[in-house]
Amino acid sequence: MEFKDTLNLPQTEFPMKGNLPNKEPEILSFWEKINLYQKLREDRKGKDKYILHDGPPYANGHIHIGHALNKILKDILVKYQSMKGKDAPFVPGWDCHGLPIEQQVEKELKEKKIKKEDLSKSEFRKLCREYALKFVNIQKEEFKRLGIIGNWEKPYLTMRPSYQAQEVLELGRVFNKGVAYRGKKPVYWCIYDKTAEAEAEIEYYDKKDPSIYVKFKMKDSDDTYLVIWTTTPWTLPANLGVMVHPEFDYVYFKTGKGTLIVAKELLENFKEKTGLNGEVIKQVKGKDLEFKEYYHPFIDRVSKVYLSEFVELGTGTGLVHMAPGHGQEDYIIGQRYGVDAFAPVDDEGRFIQEAPDWLKGIRVFDANDLIIEKLQEVDALIYKEVISHSYPHCWRCKNPVIFRATPQWFISMEAKVNENQTLREAALKEIERVKWIPYYGQNRIKSMVENRPDWCISRQRSWGVPITVFYCENCGEIVKDMEVFEHVANLIKNDEFGADIWFEKLVKELLPEGYKCKKCGGQEFKKEEDILDVWFDSGVSHAAVLKYGEWEELRWPADMYLEGSDQHRGWFQSSLLESVASYNRAPYDTVLTHGFTLDEKGRKMSKSAGNVVAPEKVIKEYGADILRLWVVTEDYTEDIKIGFNLIKRIAEDYRKIRNTFRYFLGNLYDFNPNQDYVPYENLLEIDRWMLSKLQNIIQIADKSYEEGKFHKIYHTIKNFVIVDLSAIYLDILKDRLYVYAPKSLERKSAQTVLWELLLSLNKILAPIISFTAEEVWQYVRKIDSNIKESIHLEIMPVVNEKFIDKNLEETYEKLLEVRDDILKAIEEARKQDLVRHPYEARVILKLPKEYKEIVEKRLDWIKFFFTVSQVELSDNPEGDVVINGESVKDSVIAVSKAKGEKCPRCWIYDESVGRNGQPVCDRCKIQLEIMNIKLEELA
């Protein structure tokens, strides 16, 4: 027998290498086999619920890194709440309607040389449904591969008949509250997709446009002109007024081009820009100009000056050309003065017959140059240049949009939703009540809701939920009775293809039998052809899924909505407005937002830049747990960087965490927690110190999970594993675990704490590195078969007050300071070739009183803490290397060669080795006797 055969060396089959790309699918199969999601529901039945409502991703294309970030964050939170003992179900969902799917289907039809016009609406909708379902199934598998646990068997889809039916009922509630109305007002309009757009569908990009100063001749004076500035010359045919601020000062500036009226504060800027010189001959207040008349420069039309609080003095002239059909603020002022929302432009952005002949059929952006030429021709152009400015674009086709007044359905922000409040007021009140993480999200959504226009909910497309209202053919009355909405909702719910029936059935088949107009008694009706905005689709998910849905595990309202910060103007807002309109309450209590993903250099990702990181690639190379770990490396409330150099570093951190678990398992192969667990009071002091440290970790982790600060958990555990454990405690422990007899108190005390560390750290990390935690857990079950069959069925560790010993922690902080100085002295001795290993060292210490007393009390075993062979205290230390301590002031550390010979079993140098022919040190001799091993049996 060799000496190494007498040591308790680690034994485990837990692999050093994770091989996650191959291992993780096995764990997924295990979760499916045991039906983990259902088991969790059974296990947590009757417990307090925690509902995180999933904001539905769009069913188009493969998932990208932003999807992965979002779903992993949700999964971490849900798993944590579940491991806190709550019933935390997760029902994933998909947004299935909308223009991008229509465009993809149209593209596929084009490839097959089929015209969309040759298909009925139902046939086209069927193709859209199939396309959406294909990507729901693709994305479902991709999300599952990330380790997301949820009700994948029964997700919610906005195109399901039951969902569409509930959406129709929600629409009915909104109508019956008097919040919805039909009106003609300017909305964002995409001239390429030929549909209205929501504010949330708008993206801003830089665009080059003409910037022109134009003079409008005053009616009451031969040579006096109002001067306006615009970057949209194409809107001039729709000009029906000029707006001035009532309180601003305006001057009459006499020049060679006539007397020009501009804001006093902008005169110098105007002179500099145009190069015009002259003199101010008169000054008036804006309110003095109200109702003054002027001639349109190229259309035979007289219009007036109106007062507007929206006029600003940032740029231009302080006089704003007013086209109520092409601007939100223009429209508001137009309504105030009874001016029509005139927009002589069709769905494709082409001028129609109400425009001058020379513009008919021309697209708006192409008309700019023609209009500028005309202004020059009639001597109305004062100055022109080209500027680059931020301009709204369609998020789908990336083309610039216009404001265009068209008949649409709106949800009014000023309609009363209860006795005391308008929708805007009630929504703002709820914003105050809801908790926003990070806190500045509250101000963001608050300012958006304060300033937003009425919500345009109608779209002129095919693939969506219809606006289920009827019009009386006899008197024009809009039919919006709740009984009609309920009747249509019932038809949709019970039809295999849901809302398709609206486009297939005759009007009389959609109305209740014998239905008559409440106003005139007429029985002839026509149905609305527009569909609902997709933001209304997803905005009613709180009702269609949580409140009235078919998932008994859910409840309304949600505890948490968690999405990207762009959803303050998207899903958070549409859900808030719909819920407040219908139920006078926000559908959520807390809203948490994350930032966007950037490349390693902090740049936006794009295919053209070649810096896109696909989740699939990371998973294939490194595994999903590395991606999950990436999510918690930084504060995700800010933008978060990703790239393969970063992923490599995270994989290295993962390796250290994994090897720590391997250390635990390897040294617990003979530990039976039911028999070998050492009571706290019998533990060795250093083990009690580590238990106290562990309680701090549990406390920080719990607080950080509660606050959603997952990066704090990652950095806390990373430092604990690399510094406190690997570099200190586990390093010190090796001697005791390997050398002492298997059943000795010294070894069992260490194993007891390793067991506590293993259970606690694995549970804390389970929501984050879910696959690895499960893999570790299955090895833990070999040690204790009584524990739950999955780590995710377990409960988070709680702080054990009995284990907290702050005095002991302070004592060990001081011992660690001494240890730091000793290691520096040994490193110096190593450089001088005096020692190769710390065990070869004898250390003599001179310490200040407080430190000396601490070491003196522990002198019989402190050498193991310092990982040297001998430790002595002296007021005058001498040795081969002598240094002054840095961590402990007024300390001196001397290092010499250790006395005695090296024990071949424990490698510590001791004077008992070789004495009277004894081959090992006294300590090893005692341990071997306990183990019934005779010295003569050893080689």
From Swiss-Prot:
InterPro entries: aa-tRNA-synth_I_CS (IPR001412), aa-tRNA-synth_Ia (IPR002300), Anticodon_Ile_BEm (IPR033708), Ile-tRNA-ligase (IPR002301), Ile-tRNA-ligase_type1 (IPR023585), Ile-tRNA_ligase (IPR050081), M/V/L/I-tRNA-synth_anticd-bd (IPR013155), Rossmann-like_a/b/a_fold (IPR014729)
Alphabetic keyword roster: Aminoacyl-tRNA synthetase, ATP-binding, Cytoplasm, Ligase, Metal-binding, Nucleotide-binding, Protein biosynthesis, Zinc
Chemical reaction(s) catalysed: tRNA(Ile) + L-isoleucine + ATP = L-isoleucyl-tRNA(Ile) + AMP + diphosphate
EC code: 6.1.1.5
GO biological process, alphabetically ordered: isoleucyl-tRNA aminoacylation
UniProt subcellular location: Cytoplasm
Cofactor: Zn(2+)
Gene: ileS
Protein's recorded name: Isoleucine--tRNA ligase
